[in-house]
């Protein structure tokens, strides 16, 4: 069975569309992984504890918050900036509020600028490590514990950094299965 030139072209085009779709689907997780591994684009490090060394030099940390289009939450930092000593653990809070009449889940992506500081800004604990689920009308304060690695003062570019901006963007995600089941259940019905 021989295919006509039109059928071959159509088959080739379908293959191109499938490959492009797969590549676009894989691009976001691949880019996220790449940035976390290399610190590219200001991606921060994750640490289990702060370093033992705390320097006298301070650095100003600014906090920024945004939402992707369609994310219904209100989201903001509870402080605009703070001054921390390099190596000292800082603790900041963000607030999220779900003004809708439905349960909404979200995850936060993050970035640090300038890019030279990304590899030296380490988070010990962060709301961005897990998915957040807010019930209708729920308001929460979410902490982020961090430090600036003292090695920044020895970095060719990092030693000139005097201010770091930590930015978060909240993205709406699918509700976890158990939350979706609860949200779909009519009010007043008890499953027990």
Swiss-Prot record:
The chain crosses the membrane at residues 10-30. GO terms for molecular function: copper ion binding. It is a single-pass type II membrane protein. It comes from Cereibacter sphaeroides (strain ATCC 17025 / ATH 2.4.3) (Rhodobacter sphaeroides). This is Cytochrome c oxidase assembly protein CtaG. Residues 31-192 are periplasmic. Residues 1-9 are cytoplasmic. Belongs to the COX11/CtaG family. Exerts its effect at some terminal stage of cytochrome c oxidase synthesis, probably by being involved in the insertion of the copper B into subunit I. Keywords: Cell inner membrane, Cell membrane, Copper, Membrane, Signal-anchor, Transmembrane, Transmembrane helix. Gene3D superfamilies: Ctag/Cox11.
């Amino acid at each position: 069975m021989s295919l006509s030139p039109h059928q071959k072209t159509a088959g080739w085009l379908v293959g191109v569309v499938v490959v492009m779709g797969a590549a676009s689907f894989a691009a976001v997780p691949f880019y996220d992984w790449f940035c976390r591994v290399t610190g590219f684009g200001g991606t921060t490090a994750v640490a289990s504890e702060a370093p033992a060394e705390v320097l006298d030099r301070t650095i100003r940390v600014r906090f920024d918050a945004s939402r992707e289009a369609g994310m219904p939450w209100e989201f903001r930092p509870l402080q605009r900036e703070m001054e921390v000593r390099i190596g000292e653990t800082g603790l900041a809070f963000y607030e999220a509020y779900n003004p809708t009449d439905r349960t909404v889940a979200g995850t936060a992506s993050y970035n640090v600028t300038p890019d030279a500081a990304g590899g030296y800004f380490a988070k010990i604990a962060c709301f961005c490590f897990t998915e957040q689920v807010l019930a209708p009308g729920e308001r929460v304060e979410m902490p982020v514990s961090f430090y600036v690695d003292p090695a920044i003062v020895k970095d060719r570019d990092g030693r000139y950094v005097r201010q770091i901006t930590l930015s978060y963007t909240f993205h709406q995600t699918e509700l976890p299965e158990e939350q979706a089941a609860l949200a779909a259940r009519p009010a007043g019905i008890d499953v027990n």
